[in-house]
């Protein structure tokens, strides 16, 4: 009889890798799915849902991400400060031009599980608007995504 083995947290931390993703001309949703899978560790053979076994992901050129269709014009993103009249509305064009890092972070966060691990998983995501990032010392593996 074959027994399944569960991944231990210490082993998962020791096996973590760094990946670099260039978001130039990639569709937001398709990029977010791949990034969320890597952050959770679903690309690994020993995936365990209750252990944070995912890798680190650095996303560069976030201001060059693409929204398909009319989403840049018609879709809005909302923030509320929890004060009266504190609702902020931002269009897709504004989110891409000014807050592209927050746009990708929100999209990936929505694809993560809604439990205690979500914050730990999201802390392994680093997003930069241009191609300069301070993670050269980690020697990230360049991940080529063919998503169009």
Curated annotation (Swiss-Prot):
<comment type="subunit">
    <text>Part of the 50S ribosomal subunit.</text>
</comment>
<comment type="function">
    <text>This protein is one of the early assembly proteins of the 50S ribosomal subunit, although it is not seen to bind rRNA by itself. It is important during the early stages of 50S assembly.</text>
</comment>
<dbReference type="GO" id="GO:0003735">
    <property type="term" value="F:structural constituent of ribosome"/>
</dbReference>
<dbReference type="InterPro" id="IPR005822">
    <property type="entry name" value="Ribosomal_uL13"/>
</dbReference>
<dbReference type="InterPro" id="IPR005823">
    <property type="entry name" value="Ribosomal_uL13_bac-type"/>
</dbReference>
<dbReference type="Pfam" id="PF00572">
    <property type="entry name" value="Ribosomal_L13"/>
</dbReference>
<dbReference type="GO" id="GO:0022625">
    <property type="term" value="C:cytosolic large ribosomal subunit"/>
</dbReference>
<keyword id="KW-0687">Ribonucleoprotein</keyword>
<dbReference type="InterPro" id="IPR036899">
    <property type="entry name" value="Ribosomal_uL13_sf"/>
</dbReference>
<dbReference type="GO" id="GO:0017148">
    <property type="term" value="P:negative regulation of translation"/>
</dbReference>
<comment type="similarity">
    <text>Belongs to the universal ribosomal protein uL13 family.</text>
</comment>
<protein>
    <recommendedName>
        <fullName>Large ribosomal subunit protein uL13</fullName>
    </recommendedName>
</protein>
<dbReference type="GO" id="GO:0006412">
    <property type="term" value="P:translation"/>
</dbReference>
<keyword id="KW-0689">Ribosomal protein</keyword>
<dbReference type="GO" id="GO:0003729">
    <property type="term" value="F:mRNA binding"/>
</dbReference>
